[in-house]
Amino acid sequence: MPKRTDISNILLIGSGPIVIGQACEFDYSGTQSCKTLKSLGYRVILINSNPATVMTDPEFSHQTYIQPITPENIAAIIKKEKIDAILPTMGGQTALNAVMQMHQRGMLEGVELLGAKIEAIKKGEDRQAFKEAMLKIGMDLPKGRYAYSELEALEAISEIGFPAIIRASFTLAGGGSGVAYNIEEFQELAKNALDASPINEILIEESLLGWKEYEMEVIRDGKDNCIIVCCIENIDPMGVHTGDSITIAPSLTLTDKEYQRMRDASFAILREIGVDTGGSNVQFAIHPETLRMVVIEMNPRVSRSSALASKATGFPIAKVATMLAVGFSLDEIKNDITNTPASFEPSLDYIVVKIPRFAFEKFAGVSSTLGTSMKSIGEVMAIGGNFLEALQKALCSLENNWLGFESLSKDLEAIKKEIRRPNPKRLLYIADAFRLGVSVDEVFELCQIDRWFLSQIQKLVKAEEGINSSVLTDAKKLRGLKNLGFSDARIATKIKENENLEVSPFEVELARSNLQIAPHFEEVDTCAAEFLSLTPYLYSTYAPNPLPPIGNKQEKQEKKILIIGSGPNRIGQGIEFDYCCVHASFALKDLNIKSVMLNCNPETVSTDYDTSDTLYFEPIHFECVKSIIQRERVDGIIVHFGGQTPLKLAKDLAKMQAPIIGTPFKVIDIAEDREKFSLFLKELDIKQPENGMAKSVDEAYSIANAIGFPIIVRPSYVLGGQHMQILENIEELRHYLESVTHSLEISPKNPLLIDKFLEKAVELDVDAICDKKEVYIAGILQHIEEAGIHSGDSACFIPSTLSPEILDEIERVSAKIALHLGVVGLLNIQFAVYQNSLYLIEVNPRASRTVPFLSKALGVPLAKVATRVMVLEDLKEALKFYDKKNIVEYSKGVYKPKMPHFVALKEAVFPFNKLYGSDLILGPEMKSTGEVMGIARSLGLAFFKAQTACFNPIKNKGLIFVSIKDKDKEEACVLMKRLVELGFELCTTEGTHKALEKAGVKSLKVLKISEGRPNIMDLMMNGEISMAINTSDHKSQDDAKLIRASVLKNHVSYFTTLSAIEVLLLALEESSQEDELLALQDYLK
């Protein structure tokens, strides 16, 4: 059946900002879908609020609406663009929920849904409808009951018994779900789940804790052809959300009979739900002893697991699902990797392991115990010839300084406690248990992880015990260790531990070289090497290979450049850096240079099979990078676009004289080394805050006293402001040093940076591109939040409202720094304007997280321009090549973009609602997971749109709760008076009430939690508070923390800085004005 010709305008709904449960995988699927629809001749219209995505680049759609994903905006686009059909299955839960809301409100008249019809979405997502559908086709389900109120939930639990699992309908990443072991826990979980479900429906089920969990990635076409793309096995048993579980593909502990039962059931489920053109994810649980199989749930859309399955098999699920949605059948679609029909089920001759990445260190008070509600921020994937090789490679990919199965404890009781408790380090504690002689059966009783996986870890521990210096001369032993996934660095560490002999990773590598032990590279080809692979998608392995290996060296023909990616998503290093790597690949294609991509993140566009000419799915470690450089014999290496991950490799790469292109290592070193950089700034006569670098705890005290408080402290070489704090006095410094030295040593190698804190300063981000001769000031972004809040967490906008004189000085100083440093490529500079003077805060000679936003806002693709500059060292030529709309002008000695006639604002998105116990107050340590963009004709309207897009909508009437810290009260009174004049009522606790009363501002006094009832929490729970303003800090009393927790729990919109309140007032004053709904292409005309 050929493509449909009765539709022409297709609207694709994106997933919005990166949040827990919905990350870069939907940029990958959305980008693939946009490209596919466009190549088929359809007119593609996209709505997505996330500017850091590749899919929102204007060339991927005919009209790109970077707007909040609301039913109202979608309806307006349908009318304006004359939409024939909507594809909602590429935008995660966000897209499905949006179309369901529109359907319920009668807003989809005359528009067809592609990929999944309303009935299919309802049956798949509504737990009651799903249960009825499963019973109809004879599927076994966990015993359960539905409830729509707290009373019904209590009736259900009396029937189900404890422990019980509570699940909410139409939620993302297990939102609102949990396991209750007693009635008190149950009542709280049931209330939370009812609140989380947009249709107030929850399912109370019998516990399946300890059962084995599997996922099937299924595709079905309009002719009822069905295929299994991949069967994914969860190592962690039921009770841990699959997004937080370590998973493997293909499944290793299923019998063929069980697999066939699951396969048949998956096909029957898709038919009954009504998914007739696209992909779905179906989850099962199997009792480890009785082998009873039950259906858990299904997603009638492309999911996080679909991205993993695509990368694990090389099968482009999103592309195939898109083609099926517009009329093709599986046998009409070609697999791009092998040129065989897409109806062939993929076959794997390797093992894939996925491990999630968490960020508990960023959120004090959040439990690291894993459960049915997802908590991970990102994930890594590794491919190996056997399970242990893949597992150890995955551990090495996590970017948390693990070289393999690191030992965490020798206390057996503490180890057992950690094995019982699902947590991100559980596998490492299991290895520790085996080191202390605990048996496989004993460990199984503690964690219910399948004995096969436990015996594999035990095997690895036994192999570790035998590592000594003799392996450096014994080819059989050393090859055996490499076959088990041991890195050179881990082998060196174990030799030191076992023999107390200092051996470096380089010496292990040298021994391998002498013994002719090197990895061979294999292809991910979807067909276990049965057909010729046309796209190089590679992984390394030391596993014995019966087939002739691809080899360790490539024939040198065309020019090649290696792009080192950013690894797993985590706070401080997210999708923005992957965006830059993808653009580097596109720019190399424009230069007719072959691109070689290295990354280990299965969610991203950079690891899609057709983004680069060659893809290596490997840990971003020096050992792996070196083997790829030797194999590919690249002409250049880009380390500047993947954040801190590749930058950390620059020193070792420079030592081996690897061909780093762009800004050289010596420049990176000057910018990263505080002492060298301070000297550099003094030579250029550029102001910076008073500072010092403490190489010991004693020196930290003396520097702090010399500078004077308040100070801001941070360790060197960190991203995302980790361990960064503002300290007001010597007591706070003492407490900080006592806490930080538990995890970080302060030494000459790892000094502590101490700066004078510029209170109430206006911060700015500048992105620039330099070719050693000329400079392009790509944008000056003004922060809304004042100094002291991490730049990644602050809202920022362009054009700036600062005076022309200050802006001229920023341009002049930026150009001076870029030219004198010798930057070739991108440069990010952070400034602060304090008491009308310009201070330099820091310089990063690499891509920054603001590059995608500025590229969208101003219409110049900065990462592409920078890549071209790094290759050709000609800024003028690069700007001319990419400035298609004549945006760039030359003025006052620098290139710069013409300022737009609109305001573009970037706002951060936080995971507080997913991480119970986290505090919403911001500081110098970054906490946001994603971003949204608001574009409008004024700052107020842009802010209004951005708040809507990041789930913090501005209400234009109602009761506002206000709690202000003492030092802010005088300034706050003026702002609160304006809120009252706009028609709001204020309610405050005693201290703020007195300050407002003294200033003549009317407010209603409410009780704190500790003062009795009814108190402020009661007002929030009753839905009486429309917004909350809270500028207290982390040092505030427990009452204030409980109030902030209540704000999150009750979905109250909140603002935590006075500078944000000022822009909020602008938004409220302008909110009655209509702002025309425009596509990015219209703004950039």
From Swiss-Prot:
Annotated function: Large subunit of the glutamine-dependent carbamoyl phosphate synthetase (CPSase). CPSase catalyzes the formation of carbamoyl phosphate from the ammonia moiety of glutamine, carbonate, and phosphate donated by ATP, constituting the first step of 2 biosynthetic pathways, one leading to arginine and/or urea and the other to pyrimidine nucleotides.
GO molecular function terms noted in the UniProt entry: ATP binding; carbamoyl-phosphate synthase (ammonia) activity; carbamoyl-phosphate synthase (glutamine-hydrolyzing) activity; metal ion binding
Annotated organism of origin: Helicobacter pylori (strain J99 / ATCC 700824)
Known catalytic reactions: hydrogencarbonate + L-glutamine + 2 ATP + H2O = carbamoyl phosphate + L-glutamate + 2 ADP + phosphate + 2 H(+)
Protein name: Carbamoyl phosphate synthase large chain
Residues bound to ATP 1: R127, R167, G174, E206, L208, E213, G239, V240, H241, Q283, E297
Residues that, per the record, bind Mg(2+) 1: Q283, E297
Binding annotation for Mn(2+) 3: Q830, E842
Matches recorded under PANTHER family: CARBAMOYL-PHOSPHATE SYNTHASE [AMMONIA], MITOCHONDRIAL (PTHR11405:SF53), CARBAMOYLTRANSFERASE FAMILY MEMBER (PTHR11405)
Residue ranges, annotated region (Oligomerization domain): 400-551
A single GO BP: 'de novo' UMP biosynthetic process
Binding site for ATP 2: R714, K756, L758, E763, G788, I789, H790, S791, Q830, E842
Annotated Mn(2+) 1 binding sites: Q283, E297
Pfam families: CPSase_L_D2 (PF02786), CPSase_L_D3 (PF02787), MGS (PF02142)
Binding site residues for Mg(2+) 4: E842, N844
